[in-house]
């Protein structure tokens, strides 16, 4: 099954995401913040990254820019955010995220969104 990297600073959210994805057979790697992101991508070679936008230190937009400037530029990255304001989805997609998931997640829709991203489906920009 595909390997998925979750970049999320909330232990509760990390636990929930990991549980939902491992129940579907995915291999999940977790990172509590942006430190070591590129090294983790190099070491673990995930097929998809789920990244919180609001992280301590570097935010998700900064980390996405680092991914897009690296050898992993083509990697699918979905934005995760609890601060869903008007225009946030468009801003995330314009910045280069391949999708956008709001928290709290819908536990039935979340795995479907992940599967679609793994299948290469991207939202209209």
What are these regions (language model features)?
Residues 39, 61-73:
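Short amphipathic alpha-helix used as the core "switch/output" element in two-component signaling
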Residues 11-29:
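Two-component/phosphorelay signaling modules centered on CheY-like receiver
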Residues 8:
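Conserved acidic carboxylate
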Residues 12, 33, 59-62:
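Acidic catalytic/metal-coordinating carboxylates
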Residues 56, 70, 85:
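The feature encodes the CheY-like receiver
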């Amino acid at each position: 099954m595909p390997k998925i990297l979750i970049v999320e600073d909330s232990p509760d959210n990390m636990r929930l995401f990991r549980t939902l994805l491992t129940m579907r057979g995915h291999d999940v790697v977790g990172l509590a913040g942006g430190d070591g992101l590129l090294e983790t991508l190099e070491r673990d070679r995930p097929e998809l990254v789920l990244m919180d936008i609001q992280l301590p230190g570097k935010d998700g937009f900064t980390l996405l820019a680092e991914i897009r400037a690296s050898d992993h530029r083509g990697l699918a990255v979905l934005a995760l955010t609890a601060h869903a304001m008007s225009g946030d989805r468009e801003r995330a997609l314009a910045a280069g995220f391949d999708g956008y998931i709001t928290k709290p997640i819908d536990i039935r829709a979340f795995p479907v969104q992940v599967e679609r991203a793994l299948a290469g489906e991207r939202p209209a920009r």
